[in-house]
Amino acid sequence: MNVSAIIVEYNPMHNGHLYHIKKTKELTNCDALVCIMSGNFVQRGFPSILDKWTKANMAISNGVDLVIELPTLYSLSSAEFFSFGAVSTLDSLNIINSICFGSEIGNINALQDIATTLLEEPLEYKILLKNYLDKGISFAKARNLALVELNRDNKIMSENINKILSLSNNILGIEYLKSLLLLNSSIKPFTITREGADYKDENLHKEYSSASSIRKYLKENKNINILKDFLPLEGFLEFKRLITKGYNFSMEDSMINYIRYKYISGYKNLHNLIDVSEGLDNRIYKSLEKNFTYDSLVGEIKSKRYAYSRIGRILCQYFIGFENYDLNSLLKSTPNYMRVLASNEAGLKVLKKIKKHSSTNIYTKVPKNTNTLLNLDIKATNAYSLLNNNIRFNEDYFRSPIIIKNTIY
């Protein structure tokens, strides 16, 4: 059985994601497609616009065979740890033959070369990186500049590196490849050229629009018929239903109110979060005293050194309560379980194969004794339930995987 995998967030699922599913199947010729998906919080530093079960259901309805949850610890981490959490989980299953991701360059060899350099970290690269970081430049930009300078004698390579590392999906793809190399994984990587608008583009475009533009439109408009051209049918109908129910499409703004209350109640322990360097905690506290929306708060805090998404992840972590955990130890470990969110009949066959070939614990229901990673997922859902009225407190304990039978693609 040839099993391929994709790493996704679906915030929300749109036509570009359908293209990714279709091209993955064509490129890998797989018999089954597994996706590991961020749950109720996503890597850009937002609460997910739809809950994880609704997203999983849409994925199965649109060509995925098995959906498993990426632990919240990883979904709210940097690209490096996000990728490692996803890839190490997939690798531990011992049945995944390939992984396919979208990138702007669409060239797996170019991405592999950069990934190898970043993993091996030659001394000159380390020195260059430190010099740029000492100037107050963000890690991502400092890394780009160091790599360009490392290849300064090769003009073509230097120009290509700068172009590759300026685009978000290339960067994430490199992190996937680094994780595969680090794990000495047998999973074969593939990439497809990403179609459509950049994820930061907030304008709707014909056929392929970014998730950001769709979220923005949902926040600002009640008539969503225009979105029918950009979403799978299930997604369009779900959003149409939610609008009639007065759904909260601005959950990040609601989250800020809870965060402000936590701060004024005396919980000043942001410094325990690993992404919070010295002084950043006080910068956030001061901003919380005068900003009432997510965009205004993050906009005031962000700087050359502190990227928008990094601040967003810190706020989500603080909202959930990450500061009470030993995050350094957790991030250095590999997940020892997989949480099933949804499946079809082909996915059930994949699960049987996993049980036969892997020692990874498969959870279809929350066990009595939860490990720390799973406990964080439960806390994340409980925090999310404060923002999304469709989700109950302790929803993780009530939900079983969604099983859809007789889906054919």
Curated annotation (Swiss-Prot):
Keywords of this entry: ATP-binding, Cytoplasm, Ligase, Nucleotide-binding, RNA-binding, tRNA processing, tRNA-binding
Reported function: Catalyzes the formation of N(4)-acetylcytidine (ac(4)C) at the wobble position of elongator tRNA(Met), using acetate and ATP as substrates. First activates an acetate ion to form acetyladenylate (Ac-AMP) and then transfers the acetyl group to tRNA to form ac(4)C34.
Pfam families listed in its UniProt record: HIGH_NTase1
Annotated binding of ATP, by residue: 7-20, 102, 169, 194
UniProt KW Ligase keyword: yes
Top-rank taxon: Bacteria
Similarity field: Belongs to the TmcAL family.
Organism: Clostridium botulinum (strain 657 / Type Ba4)
Protein name per the record: tRNA(Met) cytidine acetate ligase
InterPro entries, alphabetized: Rossmann-like_a/b/a_fold (IPR014729), tRNA(Met)_cyd_acetate_ligase (IPR008513)
Catalytic class of the enzyme: ligase
MF annotations from Gene Ontology: ATP binding; ligase activity, forming carbon-nitrogen bonds; tRNA binding
Subcellular location: Cytoplasm
Enzyme Commission no: 6.3.4.-
Catalytic activity: cytidine(34) in elongator tRNA(Met) + acetate + ATP = N(4)-acetylcytidine(34) in elongator tRNA(Met) + AMP + diphosphate
GO BP term (any one): tRNA modification
Gene Ontology cellular-component terms listed: cytoplasm
